[in-house]
Amino acid sequence: MDLRTPKGTHDYGPRECYLLNRFLRAVTEVFETHGAACIDTPTFELRELLCNKYGDESRLIFDLADQGGDICSLRYDLTVSFARFLAKHRVQRLKRFQIGKVFRRDQPSVSKGRLREFVQCDLDIAGAYMEMVADAEAICIMSECLDRVGHRYQIRISSRKILNALMEHSGIGRNNFATVCSTIDKMDRLPWADIAAELRTKGLVDGQVAVLKRYVCVSGGIEVIDTLRSGELYLYSDGKKGIDDLALLFKYLGIYGVGDRAVVDLSLARGLDYYTGVIFEAALVDFKDVGSVAGGGRYDNLVSSVLGKKSEWSVPCVGFSLGVTRILSVMLKVDRRRTTETEVFVGSSGGLLLEERMGVLSRLWRAGVAAETFYTRKYGYASLMEHVRKTDIPFFLLVGEKEIAENRFRLMYGEDRALQMYGDIDTIVNFIKSHRAGQRPPAGL
């Protein structure tokens, strides 16, 4: 029997799951700090819901076989499902997060975290608020999540409204906006010559390509906004609105303390049809080959489009997705070797002492300390220590007949577990908890 996983999918072993779950716990804490609530939606949706939402990316949707009844497809992202949720339940204001698998019929690259099945983690703010307030908080939350990754990153920010003005200024018909944006969005991974060639295949002439190049190659800080305000795009209504939005957004990002991590980059287009305003994307500075690890933007019309063309009920939204699988691919390259949350390994000396170790484990567990031992035959001290080092368990507690008789156990910790302290179980628990909290050990230890 062929035991391969299908192309573009991946098994997650203990180490992968440990790192993945640790990161998801960290970002969930960030979301909840900002008052977000969790929801969940089906893994597959009615096919008609997903149609015409993703531009050129629609070809990547996995369609399920027609078995009679509903015609369904696997979800491409979590955003369209969220819009359906808002529309179905008539929710007008909600700050929500959701974690789940999504599916794309893409050409996979496991080494770069590009798969056909992968985990996404979304945060969205739905509702009408003052200009750019929700957008700024969404980018702030995304920044706080990326802080948990522990590597340098940069956030690129653009605006669909500015891009609309650029298309109009370039003489590009509105029916070509989406496909041209999809090509421009590849600039972070393709040279300009390839971008220009692809634009020409979509019907653009050399003059139009030249105008696009003059703007989409612009990148920088607040000075770019000042330059745009004095340029041709500011004369268009969409251009003026988009540029003024960016100016206000960067003001708010400065207040939140994340403005220094963001740049204006008009090559950022994000190829999805539903974006209407600010768009943003983040990449790890030292792992550019992985691609973007987070991205999102404002989508004010998606909920009404889900309800149908005649609907007047709408909910403006802004949000982002974390590319969890791509982030995991980076963590696997550089992170330490832990596979569990175990804090203490309980070993024995001078005998098997299984029941005695079980008693110690029980007390540690009840005290809220993650601990484990071997339930098989007796292992030598060297083998136990090798296991502790290999799995990066920070503490090694030794149980022997003398320790049991005196109720005084030896705890080894630090580099190569070379440091030691002695005490009863309560004292050891307090020491471990103080170490966990980054505090100085209690006096006398």
UniProtKB/Swiss-Prot annotation:
Any single Pfam family the record assigns to this protein: tRNA-synt_His
EC number: 6.1.1.21
Main localization category: cytoplasm
GO terms of molecular function: ATP binding; histidine-tRNA ligase activity; RNA binding
Keywords associated with the record: Aminoacyl-tRNA synthetase, ATP-binding, Cytoplasm, Ligase, Nucleotide-binding, Protein biosynthesis
Catalytic activity: tRNA(His) + L-histidine + ATP = L-histidyl-tRNA(His) + AMP + diphosphate + H(+)
Lineage: superkingdom: Eukaryota
Broad class of enzyme this protein falls into: ligase
Biological processes per GO annotation: histidyl-tRNA aminoacylation; mitochondrial translation
GO cellular-component term (any): mitochondrion
Cell compartment(s), UniProt: Cytoplasm
Family statement drawn from the similarity comment of this UniProt entry: Belongs to the class-II aminoacyl-tRNA synthetase family.
PANTHER family registered for this protein in UniProt: HISTIDINE--TRNA LIGASE, HISTIDYL-TRNA SYNTHETASE
Name recorded for this polypeptide: Probable histidine--tRNA ligase, cytoplasmic
Organism per entry: Antonospora locustae
Classification lineage: Eukaryota, Fungi, Fungi incertae sedis, Microsporidia, Antonospora
